[in-house]
Design a protein with these regions (language model features):
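Conserved acid/base catalytic micro-environments in cytosolic active-site loops
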Residues: 1-8, 14-25, 29, 40-55, ...
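Glycine-rich phosphate/oxyanion-binding loops and their immediately adjacent helices
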Residues: 37
């Protein structure tokens, strides 16, 4: 029998610590082994209690979560989930750049009334974080800041033969890291990513993804050529599409939100269906809502294939579940095998449930 995931809860609010402990303790797969009020206590208890996962508040006395994080990373193999305020995306992604595995946004008001809703997401994020290899977390911490560069050796800027469109929302950043760590150059493909994020997070996500693979990662700009071995991440506030046939370009549009979000996956997937036809692959990862389901249907109808994250490995099985229910999932797979399924698809091995 697998032992429970050991969790250390860190927050300067006694009420929040109590509520989180109670909420997490309902799941027998998780054991809260301790709590801490300050960053200093968090460091000490991480060493003493050896938790698998630390939930770490950002704003705390003595040492903030940001200041305590590098000490926790250096002194343990614990995966760290940041508890972030909605008004500090730059600080949250600074924490991710320092090695935190994931984050959850605390509501500015009414945290007590929201705990039931948040606890289910937090439990799933804890389980997902636990699956992240400690050495990959360390690689993120040790890597120097990078400026993503799309310059390629001679011959590498030819248009791709296949397009891979990837959609993610809640739980998406670590899921994307897992997927791209299993992909690399030489597959004659370009990758187009829609990740639902608050404003200000996209550039940091691109920097993190660039550390997982030898692909080039860029924040997409209107009119960019679509080149093989490059991943284009949609910027906040604009829908991303790919247009053209022989020569493919990125198109960014300030059109109305779809499913309440912009960028949304459906416009991207539908454009990939039109531009790539049978050479298109759609991937729907963890996330709330139904974004990606309609676009996946378009890709399948155009002769392409879709790969959908399974319920067990998803933080929220909203987007993947909606895709399955519409009958647009060519294959359903756990997160850790999705990169393998993408490679198989790129090599022409078609997979169907």
């Amino acid at each position: 029998m697998r032992s429970a995931i050991k969790v250390l809860v860190v927050d300067d609010s006694a009420l929040t610590r109590q509520m989180l402990t109670r909420a997490l303790s309902v799941d027998p797969a998780v054991e809260v082994v301790g709590t801490a009020r300050t960053g200093v206590e968090a460091i000490e208890k991480t060493v003493a209690l050896v938790p698998d996962v630390v939930t770490l508040d950002i704003e705390m006395p003595e040492l903030t979560g940001i200041e305590a994080l590098p000490h926790i990373i250096r002194s343990s193999t614990a995966r760290v989930i940041m508890l972030s305020g909605v008004d500090d995306p730059d600080t949250t992604y600074q924490a991710l750049d320092l090695g935190a595995t994931d984050f959850i946004v605390k509501p500015a008001e009414g945290f007590a009334s929201s705990i039931a809703e948040l606890s289910d997401i937090l439990l799933k994020k804890i389980k997902l974080a636990y699956r992240v290899r400690p050495e990959s977390r360390m690689a993120v911490r040790e890597a120097a800041p990078v400026v993503c560069d799309v310059q390629r050796p001679d011959g590498a800027t030819a248009p791709p033969s296949r397009l891979v469109a990837i959609a993610a929302s809640t739980g998406g950043p670590p899921a994307l890291e897992t997927v791209f760590s299993g992909l690399g150059s030489g597959l004659d493909a370009a990758y187009l990513v829609v990740q639902h994020l608050p404003k200000g997070f996209t550039s940091s996500l691109v920097r993190r993804l660039a550390r997982t693979s030898d692909l080039a990662f860029v924040v997409a700009e209107d009119g960019m050529l679509v080149e093989r071995d490059t991943a284009y991440v949609a910027p906040h506030g604009l829908h991303m599409k790919v247009t053209g046939r022989r020569t493919l370009r990125i198109t960014l549009e300030d059109t109305p939100s779809v499913h309440g979000v912009r960028p949304a996956a459906d416009p991207l997937f539908q454009s990939v269906a039109g531009a790539a036809g049978a050479q298109g692959i759609g991937v729907v990862l963890t996330g709330m809502g139904a974004d990606g389901a309609r676009g996946s249907r378009a890709i399948v109808d155009a002769g392409g294939m879709t790969i959908v994250q399974d319920e067990g490995s998803s933080v929220v099985w909203g987007m993947p579940g909606a895709t399955v229910r519409t009958g647009a999932a060519s294959h359903v797979a756990p997160l850790e095998t999705i990169a393998t399924e993408i490679r198989r698809g790129l090599r022409g091995v078609r997979v169907h449930e």
